[in-house]
């Protein structure tokens, strides 16, 4: 029966180690395993992505995304296995906005969830504006991010074609 207290002590120590590993540690200005820095990294990627979409900078979108990439909307689910296919879809989406006199998009709400050290999601609502300053489309989606080789990529979108609650 002396084994039971030893097992209990081992479990407590291991749980304590695991809990302590989620704390922010700063050594020489480097944040290790910080939820705040992970969320900031997602926010930066979202801003870069939004700016690239507005400016039709498809090479930047290519740099911010990774394949396979999945796009889910109300009508279909599409998986892109090559960057060429993915960028062609982004061009199709972006170019179709020209007839609406698209100017820019603004994020109206954002909720970022870090699932683990590699995967994060962002539930985002946005408005698309025309050059006159009017909103011609409101949308909402969940964007999927994965970290690979210490770099974050957009790997998928679940998109509502209207601003319906997700």
Question: What do these predicted regions represent?
Answer:
Residues 49, 61-62, 69, 86, ...:
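Hydrophobic pocket/interface hotspot
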Residues 1-26:
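Bacterial Sec-dependent N-terminal signal peptides
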Residues 18-27, 136-166:
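Short beta-strand edge/turn micro-motifs at domain boundaries
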């Amino acid at each position: 029966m002396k084994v039971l207290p030893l097992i209990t002590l081992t479990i407590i120590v291991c749980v304590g180690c695991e809990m302590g590993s989620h704390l922010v540690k700063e050594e020489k200005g480097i944040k290790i395993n910080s939820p705040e820095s992970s969320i900031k990294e997602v926010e930066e990627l979202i801003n870069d992505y939004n700016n690239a979409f507005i400016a039709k900078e498809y090479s930047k979108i290519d740099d911010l995304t990774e394949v396979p990439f999945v796009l889910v909307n109300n009508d279909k689910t599409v998986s892109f296995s090559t960057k060429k296919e993915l960028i062609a879809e982004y061009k199709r989406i972006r170019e179709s906005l020209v007839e609406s006199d698209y100017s820019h998009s603004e994020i109206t709400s954002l909720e970022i969830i870090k699932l683990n050290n590699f995967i994060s999601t962002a539930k985002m609502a946005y408005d698309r504006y025309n050059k006159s300053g009017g909103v011609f489309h409101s949308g909402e989606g969940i964007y999927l991010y994965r970290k690979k080789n210490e770099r974050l990529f957009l790997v998928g979108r679940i998109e509502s074609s209207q601003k319906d609650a997700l």
